[in-house]
Amino acid sequence: QFRNWFYSLLAMSAEMEGKAPFKTLLGHALVKDENGREMHKSWGNAIWFDDAAEKMGVDVMRWMYSLQNVEQNLLFGYGPADEVRKKLITLWNVYSFYATYAAVDGFDPIKNPIKWDLLSILDKWIIAKTHLLIRNADHYLEKFRVDSFMKDFELYLEELSNWYIRRNRRRFWKSEDDEDKKSAYATLYHVLDNIIKMIAPVLPFVSESIYQNLIRNSDSNAPESIHLCDFPNS
């Protein structure tokens, strides 16, 4: 990449426009197969992009690359992709949980914004965790350490799924449409709104799909795409 693609970009831009095409360039170490061997067509271990995109999914591939320390070789294959896909499914399941029960109860996040004085301890905890993640994400991305951000995101996703939602399910399931139930919905909506905007640079397709169904369906004044939204504030 450095000798060919990046150099070609630099040479052509300098010659044709008199300026560099980029201010900062981030490269990574080698991509090898999941056993650490170089990929060769003759060895039968090469994975072509179109095949990987079809079988793994593009966002799964992007998650794999983003999670990798750029100073180390990436071990690329369908086995590691399956592990990442499980995490992506967890994110989707969090969204699906909210979407399913909010639809059943007719919850409108625009008409029922967060009432901060009515939040439970768990609500306050997950909101604090969310905004801490936003702050750390901003710090890591400024330093081009996407891998550090993704490691934090994976830990956060585990807490959101296995702690907040699992220990709050009865609040969503109960028949009474009271303020406690509305607070749970409003909190989860707030959390999802922030995390999909935060993760959009890494997972552009999944985040866009969630955004259109979650945010645009609720707020007609929201930007047309998640990729037109500002990065969330901590």
Residue ranges and their predicted role:
Residues 28-29, 91, 160, 204:
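Residue-level signal for inorganic ion chemistry
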Residues 105-135, 166-234:
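Acidic, turn-prone loop/beta-hairpin segments
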Residues 5, 18-25, 61, 72-77, ...:
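Acidic/polar loop patches that form or flank catalytic/metal-binding clefts of enzymes
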Residues 78-84, 145, 180-188:
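Membrane-interfacial loop-to-helix junctions in multi-pass inner-membrane proteins
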Residues 30-116, 216-222:
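Catalytic adenosine-cofactor/nucleotide-binding cores of aminoacyl-tRNA synthetases and other
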Residues 9, 25, 60-68, 92-95, ...:
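Short alpha-helical scaffolding segments that buttress acidic/His motifs in well-ordered protein cores
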Residues 137, 141-148:
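Short helix-adjacent coil turns
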Residues 2-18:
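Metal-dependent nuclease catalytic cores in nucleic-acid-processing enzymes
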